[in-house]
Amino acid sequence: MAELAQFAKMNGLGNAIIVADMRGRADRVRPEAAQRLASDPATHFDQIMAIHDPRLEGTENYIEIINSDGSVAQACGNGMRCVVQRLAAETGRPSFTFETIAGVLSAEEHANGLISVDMGKPRFGWQDIPLAEEFHDTRKIELQVGPIDKPVLHSPSVASMGNPHAIFWVEDDPYSYDLERFGPMLENHPIFPERANITIARVDSPEELTMRTWERGAGLTLACGSAACAAAVSAARTGRTGRGVKVNLPGGSLEILWRDDDHVIMTGPAEWEFSGRFDPATGAWERETEGAA
């Protein structure tokens, strides 16, 4: 067995996260190790946030994001808050800058324990999301579920927060839709060459949304931070809301602000559950401590 790596089992509004400390190591978390951890009820996760040594000058760490199916993800807002909470507890510092596959992100822990992450700038071009077909206006694209004359879901807004998102707007309860059925089909629709995160969202007021998400590579989730950001900017872009909204998710609420400089700021909590050690090659693990940090 290889030398074990430290990890913290955490959650961001119920979005199950493993923060893996891979600093000082040359190896990576292998897909089969991720799948093994995800299949264990004690360590089941939506994303692994693997903290590596910095590769880019001016950043503290490189963060690799791994889905529960072993695939690599470009963004995970809830996971970034968990990383910040752990590193802030370790270093006593409130602010950090990270490199991810999607670019550089900055984050800060506030005195009240909430954590803000600058998720960067959204992208709306069809090639940037990406889509398999050209759409000049991605505020609403041609895509539907159900009969042509009476679709169940249709005309989503699409956007990228470093990862692709489709947001279906509804006027009734987002929980009344069978997302467990529609989610996999839409995630893997040919229009999305890199697959997509699928969200059903309702506008409650000009300052509030309610939504739920089928997460690419992870499935139904209690919270998806990048999806909340994508829904918030899409709501503002289509005139449904202002640029600052409260987003209600199954696991709780996030505050999303689309600033005038085009950066999207996500604010919410992170919670530690227990710590342990694991083998990044196989996923074998052992528990060390548990309880609230």
UniProtKB/Swiss-Prot annotation:
Q: Which residues form the active site?
A: 76, 224
Q: Does the keyword Endoplasmic reticulum apply?
A: no
Main localization of the protein described in the UniProt heading: cytoplasm
**Superkingdom of the organism of origin:** Bacteria
Q: PANTHER family attached here?
A: DIAMINOPIMELATE EPIMERASE (PTHR31689:SF0), DIAMINOPIMELATE EPIMERASE, CHLOROPLASTIC (PTHR31689)
The text of the family note is: Belongs to the diaminopimelate epimerase family.
Protein name, entry field: Diaminopimelate epimerase
Native organism? Chelativorans sp. (strain BNC1)
Q: What is the lineage of its organism?
A: Bacteria, Pseudomonadati, Pseudomonadota, Alphaproteobacteria, Hyphomicrobiales
